[in-house]
Amino acid sequence: MVIKIHDLRPAPGSKRDKIRVGRGEGSKGKTAGRGTKGTKARKNVSPRFEGGQMPIHMRLPKLRGFKNRFRTEFHGVNVGKLAAAFPQGGTVGIDELISAGLANKGELVKILGDGDLEGVKLEVTAHAFTGSAQEKITAAGGSVTKLDR
């Protein structure tokens, strides 16, 4: 025998009829099983209501300060990483940093002073430099050139 989709029926007793409440004066009529009056008899309780406990939105601190929409964000590259990526020395610009994987295209690059140059002479061109990075590059015999933002 082939079973067809229109022959399928749920097992007897597995489905119950939906109870329609609040229709007429029967057992589920009028107050619809909710008792009389009070908050629980009304439509619903606000989802943020925590039963009289101080709610989470009042327990948490307020947001302070503001976010500057006009801030300039730099991608930092440390001097130690420059020495590792360019051990032979030479000219290091934004394009060289991108090809070495130290910066992404379109980012403003700032050279930071963490690490050692270990005598590597670099001519570095970037958008910004920290004081310590500038000192380390010039002390190793290199030069620093700032780009316009």
UniProtKB/Swiss-Prot annotation:
InterPro entries: Ribosomal_uL15, Ribosomal_uL15/eL18, Ribosomal_uL15/eL18_sf, Ribosomal_uL15_bac-type, Ribosomal_uL15_CS
GO CC field: cytosolic large ribosomal subunit
Coiled-coil region(s): none
Alphabetized UniProt keyword annotations: Ribonucleoprotein, Ribosomal protein, RNA-binding, rRNA-binding
Region (Disordered) residue spans: 1-54
Signal sequence bounds: none
Keyword rRNA-binding appears in the UniProt entry: yes
A Pfam family that the UniProt record links to this protein: Ribosomal_L27A
GO molecular function: rRNA binding; structural constituent of ribosome
Keyword Transmembrane on entry: no
Feature: compositional bias, Basic and acidic residues: 1-28
GO terms classed as biological process: translation
HAMAP family assigned to the protein according to its UniProt record, in alphabetical order: Ribosomal_uL15
PANTHER family attached to this UniProt entry: 50S RIBOSOMAL PROTEIN L15, LARGE RIBOSOMAL SUBUNIT PROTEIN UL15M
Self-association and partners: Part of the 50S ribosomal subunit.
Protein task: Binds to the 23S rRNA.
Family that this chain belongs to: Belongs to the universal ribosomal protein uL15 family.
The protein's name in its UniProt record: Large ribosomal subunit protein uL15
Source organism of the structure: Saccharopolyspora erythraea (strain ATCC 11635 / DSM 40517 / JCM 4748 / NBRC 13426 / NCIMB 8594 / NRRL 2338)
Gene behind this protein: rplO
